[in-house]
């Protein structure tokens, strides 16, 4: 599957006025998704997620829910999830079908990170991380009533 070709077609469908200069694979290699950093000629950057596992309808539904969650989380978690790019007030999702290939792309604004965690966590960091993840899950459960069904 030609990922750069698919990403370029996806971007053309979103905003053909901007030209892609570079596509860098930044995937964590821990899932079936492929994640790319896209840099444009004007140095703007977006993140693209490409998937070809599962069903398009589920991918689309998942990203509608993620977008709603992202926009409804309150402080201090309002910037934890990346914001999807919208077109016509909807999450823009590109579907590529060619032969046996069926892949989907969604674009995100990059999330800013003030400080990265150490590569190896000591016990204090592990406890703090666990507490923050617990608080994040509680914040997510508080917005469940406003998420799409």
What are these regions (language model features)?
Residues 51-100, 124-127:
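A conserved alpha-helical element in kinase catalytic cores
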Residues 74-81, 116-118, 142-146:
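Short secondary-structure capping/junction motifs at helix and strand boundaries
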Residues 99-114:
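Conserved short submotifs of the Hanks-type protein kinase catalytic core
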Residues 119-149:
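A cross-family kinase active-site recognition segment
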Residues 1-25:
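Juxta-kinase regulatory segment immediately upstream of eukaryotic protein kinase catalytic domains
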Residues 46-47:
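Glycine-rich ATP phosphate-binding loop
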């Amino acid at each position: 599957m030609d990922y750069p070709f698919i990403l370029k077609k996806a971007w053309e469908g979103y905003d053909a006025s901007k030209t892609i200069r570079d596509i860098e694979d930044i995937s964590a290699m821990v899932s079936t998704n492929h994640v790319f950093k896209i840099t444009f000629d004007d140095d703007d950057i977006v993140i693209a997620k490409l998937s070809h596992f599962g069903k398009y309808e589920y991918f689309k539904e998942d990203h509608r829910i993620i977008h709603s969650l992202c926009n409804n989380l309150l402080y201090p978690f309002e910037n934890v999830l990346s914001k999807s790019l919208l077109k016509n007030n909807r999450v823009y999702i590109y579907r590529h079908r060619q032969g046996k290939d069926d892949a989907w792309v969604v674009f995100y604004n990059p999330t800013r990170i003030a400080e990265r965690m150490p590569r190896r966590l000591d016990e204090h960091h592990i406890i703090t991380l666990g507490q923050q993840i617990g608080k994040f899950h509680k914040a997510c459960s508080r917005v469940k009533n406003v998420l799409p069904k």
